[in-house]
Curated annotation (Swiss-Prot):
GO terms for cellular component: chloroplast. Heterohexadecamer of 8 large and 8 small subunits. Its main location: plastid. GO terms for molecular function: ribulose-bisphosphate carboxylase activity. It comes from the Eukaryota. In this alga, in contrast to plants, the small subunit is encoded in the chloroplast. The basic functional RuBisCO is composed of a large chain homodimer in a 'head-to-tail' conformation. In form I RuBisCO this homodimer is arranged in a barrel-like tetramer with the small subunits forming a tetrameric 'cap' on each end of the 'barrel'. Belongs to the RuBisCO small chain family. The keyword Plastid applies. It is found in: Plastid, Chloroplast. The keyword Chloroplast applies. This is Ribulose bisphosphate carboxylase small subunit. Transmembrane segments: none annotated.
Length: 139
């Protein structure tokens, strides 16, 4: 099951040339770029680990792609994403994020249904990979 988080998630995986164009777009907008990774793909897991420091002053898409490739080598079985931050007053938040790498096998999620007080149903999503292995060894 392909994880669908961020922009472009329903499209085929982006090539390096397409990633470079998106990086250039973010740089043209003066957005700060960071690279993040995780092995816990839960849809509500918005706190991914940061790869190094945010690339605030880097204005060259090739340098950012170089950092992405370094992260790919170091974390080959993790999800990697680019997060673009707009620090314009009044926005000050992530305005674009997209996945640039995913594990070769994505086992998907299971939905647990629980009946609680008043016959109300509560649903929980859990990743099969998180249940099977500890953090750092999931893929």
């Amino acid at each position: 099951m392909k994880l669908t988080q961020g922009a472009f998630s329903f499209l085929p995986d982006l090539t390096d040339a397409q990633v470079t164009k998106q990086i250039q777009y973010a740089l043209n907008k003066s957005w700060a770029i960071s690279i993040e990774y995780t092995d816990d793909p839960h849809p509500r897991n918005s706190y991914w680990e940061m790869w190094g420091l945010p690339l605030f002053d880097v204005k060259d898409p090739a340098a950012i792609l170089f950092e992405i490739n370094m992260a790919r080598k170091a974390k080959p079985n993790y999800y990697l994403k680019i997060a673009c931050f707009d620090n314009t007053r009044g926005i000050e938040s992530c305005v674009l994020s997209f996945i640039v790498q995913r594990p070769s096998y994505e086992p998907g999620f299971k939905m647990t249904r629980q009946e609680v007080k008043g016959r109300q149903l509560v649903y929980t999503l859990e990743s099969y990979s998180v249940d099977a292995k500890p953090e750092g060894e999931r893929y």
